[in-house]
């Protein structure tokens, strides 16, 4: 399980000392079957965000077999497990999320979801299984701990406001020096690790707008205030916010995903409704887009005698990796001979960002796609699956991080 890295003589007391280097990949590989077993159980019994009662109990049951302090519930139904070392090393936290999605699974696999209309279609079952595997390995080597290891199992990542802020408010990062997390990613092949310093994921904001006009007969538009035409005008004008008012080297997205109005060919409705999303990596841009949308609506209201309701919900914070923690992720991957790549900026959101607002740390992606096994479906898709052989790579990455952080 280990190999001797160095052997030298300590001339002060004339003894030969050995520095030991663990083969974390070998240890993680030995835990592979166990992690797969954990993941397959979780995959069969998915639960929606903020409703994860059975999942919570299952995780607590696994942790209660280990020598760690378990704190629960943290927030609504989060779990914090702490392994305490004897030395002066830091306290490093790892986080896994465990909620599922309202998706009907279409995979024909022995571990298919048994909960109708609910599926682990984003890999959170894998995240939880990996961290439980890492916790078991840490438990087996707890006598060597120079610092403390905290495992944070988080509910409700998929739906705003997200579970992370509630868990932070309830003290899950108390005494934690640094935090790391991963997301299994089917778009990247197994055996790869992706990350980047600074911004990596966006803030996923949501908005909804109702334009209130005055309905009437389709043949007598002069007697109406047509909300459909005004909504169309707003949607087209809003396209200029990103293209004409934002520095082209900065990233932003404004997308309308839903428009609803009317129910008949010859009736102009009273109102029109739309919903959409705004994605940015920077809160100044986020505020700029919101303000510009509101000004457009104000102008249309004055010009057309309409009223409107503009509801803008700020999503998770943009996810920004801390430089030094990113370097640790990169070095760990290179030391473990994993294929490390610098990630592209991603317009998706992830509430791990809230942990990084209050503690240094880094988030990385672990490739779990495998074309040979036909595991290529995107996240949130009814055919989504993960290459379970990716678990040992993520687990060895976490263990190597503990070594580099002087905890193990």
Locate the predicted segments by residue.
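Short, small-residue-biased leader/transition segments that mark boundaries at the very start
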Residues: 1-4
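Acidic/His- and Gly-rich active-site-bordering loop/insert found
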Residues: 20-120, 125, 129-132, 136-145
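Histidine/acidic-residue-rich, glycine-tolerant segments that coordinate divalent metal ions
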Residues: 79, 101-103, 109-119, 126, ...
């Amino acid at each position: 399980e280990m190999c001797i890295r160095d052997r030298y003589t300590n001339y002060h007391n004339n003894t030969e000392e050995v520095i030991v280097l663990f083969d974390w990949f070998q240890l993680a590989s030995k835990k592979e079957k166990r992690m797969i077993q954990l993941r397959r159980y979780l995959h069969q019994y998915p639960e929606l965000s903020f409703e994860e009662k059975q999942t919570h109990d299952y995780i607590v049951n696994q942790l209660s077999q280990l020598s760690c302090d378990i704190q629960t519930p943290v927030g609504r139904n989060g779990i914090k497990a702490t392994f305490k070392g004897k030395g002066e090393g830091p306290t490093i936290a790892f986080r896994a999320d465990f909620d599922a999605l309202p998706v009907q699974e279409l995979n024909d696999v022995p571990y298919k979801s048994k909960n109708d209309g609910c599926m682990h279609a984003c890999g959170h079952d894998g995240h939880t299984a990996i961290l439980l595997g890492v916790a078991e390995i840490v438990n087996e080597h707890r006598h060597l701990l120079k610092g403390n290891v905290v495992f944070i199992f988080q509910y409700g990542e998929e739906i705003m406001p997200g579970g992370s802020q509630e868990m932070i408010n309830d003290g899950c990062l108390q005494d934690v020096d640094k935090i790391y997390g991963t997301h299994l990613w089917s778009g990247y092949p197994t055996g790869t690790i992706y990350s980047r310093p600074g911004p990596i994921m966006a803030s996923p904001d949501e908005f909804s707008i109702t334009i209130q006009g005055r309905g009437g007969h389709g043949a007598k538009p002069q007697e109406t205030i047509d909300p459909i035409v005004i909504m169309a005008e707003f949607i087209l004008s809003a396209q200029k916010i990103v293209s004409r008012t934002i520095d082209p080297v900065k990233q932003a997205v404004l997308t309308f995903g839903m428009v609803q109005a009317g129910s008949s060919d010859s009736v102009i409705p009273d109102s029109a409704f739309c919903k959409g999303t705004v994605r940015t990596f920077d809160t100044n841009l986020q505020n700029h887009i919101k303000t510009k949308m509101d000004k457009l609506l104000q102008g249309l209201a004055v010009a057309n005698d309409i009223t409107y309701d503009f509801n803008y919900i700020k999503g998770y914070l943009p996810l920004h990796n801390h430089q030094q923690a990113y370097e640790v992720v990169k070095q760990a991957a290179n030391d473990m001979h994993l294929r490390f790549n610098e990630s592209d900026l991603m317009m998706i959101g992830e509430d791990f960002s809230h942990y990084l607002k209050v503690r240094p740390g880094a988030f990385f992606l672990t490739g779990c796609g495998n074309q040979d096994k036909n595991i290529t479906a995107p996240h949130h898709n009814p055919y989504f699956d993960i290459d379970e052989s990716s678990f040992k790579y993520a687990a060895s990455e976490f263990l190597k991080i503990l070594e580099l952080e002087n905890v193990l």
